[in-house]
């Protein structure tokens, strides 16, 4: 018997992940969010964004750009992100979707992630969204294949499954990412969502994600390493000021936050009890480098 040996063996390559959070106000009042009043200097913020982009080769990184509030309230910033995306940078924008469909106009090169807690007003009770707003978000997500980020705060599983079924029936081809209402200051999670209770769908996170969530809920401890730690880094932008940190989880020690410069790697990051969208980041389609193209460093 002969066996064909392929050499070198196929390797799935992924981009680096860089999360950029800019200052911003918000136009909704989620009961689980901490919103601070702030004045945003858009030209200064754009200069800081360009300093960050200059550190990387286009298409070698997936940038996730979001705001402490709602980024589409700052059109000059989003327009600049579109410009950089058109130049070859891979940029996804996290939005609460309240400015749809206008927020999409003239920005064809951006990737989108929309925050919505389900398909009904009841599921979005903590966000205060009305049904027409929810419908516009889901319409855009289905049309664009945009990712959906859903906070699970205790909605009935029957409603969660109805949400999954609706997206399945509409041919949704993005990623539906459930994340628990975070526990502040390292306290154990207060909500649990089990994979075996959910209707199967290709757009859900893998079963291992939910197993990790269940473990943290039951024990108050982690037993696995998040992809943010293996392949991610965070930038916090406030006008001309840029701060950096490996992960911006709640209660991160202040001495681990540093000024703009080289990234710092850690053998033992002090993870708390959070679990969020970065957990299986490397498995996302947006993170994958196309087959047959291997970016090599300049030497």
UniProtKB/Swiss-Prot annotation:
SUPFAM superfamilies per UniProt: Radical SAM enzymes
Query: Which gene does this sequence derive from?
Result: neoN
GO terms (molecular function) for this protein are: 4 iron, 4 sulfur cluster binding; isomerase activity; metal ion binding
Name-wise, this protein is Neomycin C epimerase
Keyword set includes Isomerase: yes
- Enzyme type, top EC level: isomerase
Annotated [4Fe-4S] cluster 1 binding lies at: 26, 30, 33
Any single biological process term in GO: antibiotic biosynthetic process
The family this protein is said to belong to: Belongs to the radical SAM superfamily.
Cofactor(s) of this protein:
[4Fe-4S] cluster
From the UniProt record, list the reaction(s) this protein catalyses. Answer: neomycin C + AH2 + S-adenosyl-L-methionine = neomycin B + 5'-deoxyadenosine + L-methionine + A + H(+)
* Entry annotated with the keyword Transmembrane: no
Q: State which Enzyme Commission number(s) the record gives.
A: 5.1.3.-
Q: How is the cofactor bound?
A: Binds 2 [4Fe-4S] clusters. One cluster is coordinated with 3 cysteines and an exchangeable S-adenosyl-L-methionine. The second cluster is proposed to be involved in the electron-transfer mechanism for the catalytic cycle.
Q: What does this protein do?
A: Catalyzes the last step of neomycin B biosynthesis, i.e. the irreversible epimerization at C-5''' of neomycin C to give neomycin B. To a lesser extent, is also able to convert neomycin Y2 to neomycin Y1.
Its pathway is: Antibiotic biosynthesis; neomycin biosynthesis
Residues the record lists as binding [4Fe-4S] cluster 2? 226, 247, 271, 274
Identify the catalytic residues: 249 (proton donor)
| Limits of the Radical SAM core domain | 10-222
Keywords annotated in UniProt: 4Fe-4S, Antibiotic biosynthesis, Iron, Iron-sulfur, Isomerase, Metal-binding, S-adenosyl-L-methionine
């Amino acid at each position: 018997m002969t066996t064909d040996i392929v050499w070198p063996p196929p390797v799935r390559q992924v981009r680096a992940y860089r999360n950029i959070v800019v200052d911003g106000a918000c136009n909704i009042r989620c009961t689980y969010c901490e919103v601070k009043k702030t004045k945003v200097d858009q030209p200064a913020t754009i200069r800081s964004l360009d300093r960050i982009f200059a550190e990387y080769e286009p298409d070698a990184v997936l940038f996730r750009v979001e705001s402490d509030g709602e980024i589409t309230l700052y059109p000059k910033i989003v327009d600049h992100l579109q410009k950089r995306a058109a130049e070859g940078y891979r940029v996804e924008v996290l939005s609460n979707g309240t400015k749809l469909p206008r927020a999409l106009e003239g920005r064809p090169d951006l990737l989108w992630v929309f925050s919505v807690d389900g398909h009904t007003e009841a599921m979005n009770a903590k966000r205060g969204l009305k049904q027409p707003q929810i419908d516009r978000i889901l319409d855009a997500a289905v049309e664009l294949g945009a990712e959906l980020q859903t906070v699970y705060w205790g909605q009935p599983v029957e409603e969660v499954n109805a949400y999954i079924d609706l997206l399945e029936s509409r041919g949704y081809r993005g990623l539906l990412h459930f994340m628990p209402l975070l526990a502040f200051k390292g306290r154990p999670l207060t909500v649990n969502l089990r994979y075996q209770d959910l209707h199967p769908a290709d757009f859900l996170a893998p079963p291992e994600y939910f197993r990790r969530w269940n473990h943290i809920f039951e024990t108050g401890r982690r037993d696995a390493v998040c992809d943010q730690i293996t392949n991610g880094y965070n930038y916090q932008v406030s006008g001309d000021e840029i701060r950096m940190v490996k992960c911006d989880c709640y209660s991160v020690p202040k001495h681990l936050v540093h000024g703009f410069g080289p990234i710092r790697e850690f053998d033992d990051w002090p993870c708390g009890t959070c679990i969020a969208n970065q957990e299986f980041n490397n498995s996302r389609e947006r993170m994958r480098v196309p087959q047959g193209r291997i970016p090599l460093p300049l030497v």
